[in-house]
Amino acid sequence: MTTTMPATADGWDALLSDGGVVRIRPATAADEDRLLALHEAASDRSIYLRYFSLNRRAGDRYVDKVLHGGEDEIVLVAEQQGVVVGMAGCTRLGRTADGEVAMLVADSHQRRGVGTLLLEHLAAVARRAGMRSFVADTLADNGLMQQVFTDAGFRVERHSDVDVTHVRMSLTPTPQAQDAVDLRERRADVASLRHVLAPRSIVVVGASDRPGSVGGAVLRNIIAGHYRGDLKAVNPNRRWVQRLRAYPSVLSLPEPVDLAVVAVPGPAVEQVIRDCGARGIPAAVILSAGFG
């Protein structure tokens, strides 16, 4: 239904429009502090567009409602590296098949497709729960939210009332909805390859000055090829490698890079890859031997 990697018991990993990975999963009561932090970090404009006022206590009440409101509430979160970067919830309206939908995405993650992914997954969950339509009231100048409904590809009806737009979105799958998903998948797949094919920054893990070492040869070739991006080296035993400052581990890098080239012994690879994930590095090329 969306650009989704294999589902796990606690959610689905999905590609964003820029090739980044986000986990979409059901929210639980244990997420309360994370959802409150999402609201606290939101700009005044984001709060105003979401709640039609600058009253931040409205966010606190909403979080309490969706987490503790019972079976009529469905709420999903988008998570990156353990941080909730977006949430979407729907409330069944009485005994109808309508669900009132609302969402909030962290300012720094807007325009990456987080809202669209949340809406797609929420629609699938709500449909399985017997809902047939989403309804929402949005401010007329909330262009991002209007675009999220459009990008989902479902049939959408809009009616304007002064500064508010009333939206009704059918949850019935359509060829147009599938076409929209397919287009997003292709674009996200292409974007995800940029980190490998055209990285703006690289770290060589296992970089060395030692003649004949794979890490040393890789680093020399990158330098000799006049790579124009940001180049870093990781070697726990050296402070400098081939005139580059060497960091003791991936976790000690001052900022994430696009690509890690891993040239360490096979038994050390798993921990390096885990460290890359924890540091927010989206892609890795493994040149190691010694697996078995």
Identify the residue ranges that each predicted region occupies.
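Catalytic-core regions of core metabolic enzymes
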Residues: 174-292
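Long, contiguous binding/interaction regions
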Residues: 1-195, 199
